[in-house]
Structure formats: C-alpha cells, structure tokens
Amino acid sequence: MIIETHLPNLLHRGKVRDTYGIGSNLLLMVATDRISAFDVVLPNGIPHKGLVLSQMSAFWFRLTSGLIDNHFIGLADDQRVIEEYNSSNLLAQLPLEIARRSMIVRRAQRIDIESIVRGYLAGSAWAEYRRNGTVWGQRMPKSLKEGQVLSEPVFTPTTKAEQGHDQNMTHQQVVDMVGEDLARQLEEKSLAIYSFAHEYA
C-alpha cells in the first residue's frame, strides 16, 4: 500500500495525489492509496486504490478528449510515453508500483472549482432536498425519493479546498471567480461530459 511518495521535485501533496515536476512543462501525478471522504484524509488507505484511480482517469480522459481538451498525456508505465517524455530519466527509474499508478500530464492553469454534475438525488443533494426541497437552490418536485433520477442533470460546483471541506458555490460565485464566459463553459462542458459518460455507462 502506498500512502505517500517521496520522489524528486515534489510540487504538491493533495488529499489523494502527489504531484511532481518533470522539466518545465510536464507533471507526474501519482495517485496514492490515501482515502479522502467528506473532504477529510483518513489515516488508513485502501490497497491498490491509486492504481485503479489512475487507470479509470486515463480511460475517461482518453474517451472524452473529443469533447474537451485535457492535460493527459499517458500513464507513466506506457513505453511510448517513457520513450517520448523521459528527458529527465525519471520515468525509466520509477519503480513499477509507482509508474502503474501515475499519469504524465501537461502543466496547465488549474481552475479552483470542482465541476460536479448530479443526475441522481443522492449524497449532499439528497440532504439539501430533505431540508429545503431544492438541489443547489433549484426547486425540485415534491415526493422525490433518495437515489431517484433527476429529470435533468444539475451542475453543482464547489470550491476546491486544499484542506478541509469544499464549499458549495452559487452561479454568481463562479462568475465572480472566473468571469461569465468561463463560468458558462464550465457548466456546459461539465454537463456534456456527464451526459456522454452517462450514455456510455
């Protein structure tokens, strides 16, 4: 089980991933076996969680690349990626247990918003609905059941907190943070990716 990694050029240690610099324009993102639940990193991990997380991420980044450009280049154990992007020789030296759970990505400017789409009445959406009859402030029909499919998916952005709880964001808060145009793109692209993945699954 890998809870924490210790490689050269650590840039960031998040709730689940450790991120390292590779040259001037690439990053190595290592998915650990740390567990983050309800925005809290728990003391125990889950064996192979990071491996599964990276494999799933790679699958969806490849599949949705026609909908939106992304930063994904490849998995760190992919021989093609090693040959093309191994200028620092780091990739060839990675232990297999680290390489298999790691992605090589382009450096990009991160938007500190979690673009969440909800198609089912569950989790915090269910809790809000029980309290107020709303999901992200939008009035919902009466008598919905937990886990029920929503008539239309709802864009429910949150802050992307480094530590602690992510906070719900209103549309206006998103606009204030990134501007009207990018706020619209975030919502439209998030809903498009959700619909595509929902149809695929």
Model-found features: residue ranges?
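A long amphipathic alpha-helix within ATP-dependent nucleotide-binding catalytic cores
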Residues: M177-A201
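A short mid-domain helix/strand-loop element embedded in enzyme catalytic domains
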Residues: V149-E180
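Polar/charged alpha-helical tracts
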Residues: Q79-S87, Q172-Q185
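Active-site loop/lid in soluble adenylation, ligation, and acyl-transfer enzymes
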Residues: M1-T158
